[in-house]
Amino acid sequence: MALKSYKPTTPGQRGLVLIDRSELWKGRPVKSLTEGLSKKGGRNNTGRITMRRRGGGAKRLYRIVDFKRRKFDVEGVITRIEYDPNRTAFIALVTYTDGEQAYILAPQRTAVGDKVVASQKADIKPGNAMPFSGMPIGTIVHNIELKPGKGGQIARAAGTYAQFVGRDGGYAQIRLSSGELRLVRQECMATVGAVSNPDNSNQNLGKAGRNRHKGIRPSVRGVVMNPVDHPHGGGEGRTSGGRHPVTPWGKPTKGARTRNKNKASSKLIIRSRHAKKKGR
């Protein structure tokens, strides 16, 4: 999909760059694969804001996407590629030979009519899913499981991918787009190819209202708040904060490491994504 830039006939169109979605399905999603979705407004079960800058936005239906890909050795055909308001990637409707339908993340370089399959050892072509044990080294993958059978958790956003770079005991080594090198079990599933919609990051929404349609509210800087609201708040006139940048809860921000050093998953990370900053 290409990008569309607009002639500024209105102020909101000046600088506007959007994704051309003309080739996507224009109808409604499959009803049996959708659920209702209520707005949380960034609040948890106690009603407190746990995620700032959330609220409002257009109504959505949740599309049930198959991240597990455990329907082995049953071939499916991509019937259509659809827009999904709940994620940056596009989704593909797959119709299997036994009549079942499912949504999967649409990979790049796939089109309507392409065949996909999940198997212990499948062809290396975009959309096919298999465990790392049946995959050749060097394959570009997305929708990667961290625990066998849990469903894909890594490389699911638009344009993302990881590379399968080696085997180590019962583990597969993968290099993520952040630069991190980590291990996952060889039984974990992954889908061949990169995720669709790589131009997502090149969009320019042109006006604040488009972000509001997405349910994103304005970001207020801590330095313009009162002392009760933020560690950077207060002071007479404009002040520059007076301390190292911190979050509203006093944790260092702007690059300081705050990850717990005793996390169990640390032993599976061979090379940190921050290693290149340290000159390693």
Curated annotation (Swiss-Prot):
GO terms for cellular component: large ribosomal subunit. Residues 254-280 have a biased composition (Basic residues). One of its GO terms (biological process) is cytoplasmic translation. SMART domains: Ribosomal_L2, Ribosomal_L2_C. Keywords: Ribonucleoprotein, Ribosomal protein, RNA-binding, rRNA-binding. GO terms for molecular function: rRNA binding; structural constituent of ribosome; transferase activity. It holds the Pfam family Ribosomal_L2_C. NCBIfam families: rplB_bact. Belongs to the universal ribosomal protein uL2 family. Part of the 50S ribosomal subunit. Forms a bridge to the 30S subunit in the 70S ribosome. This is Large ribosomal subunit protein uL2. It comes from Dinoroseobacter shibae (strain DSM 16493 / NCIMB 14021 / DFL 12). The gene is rplB.
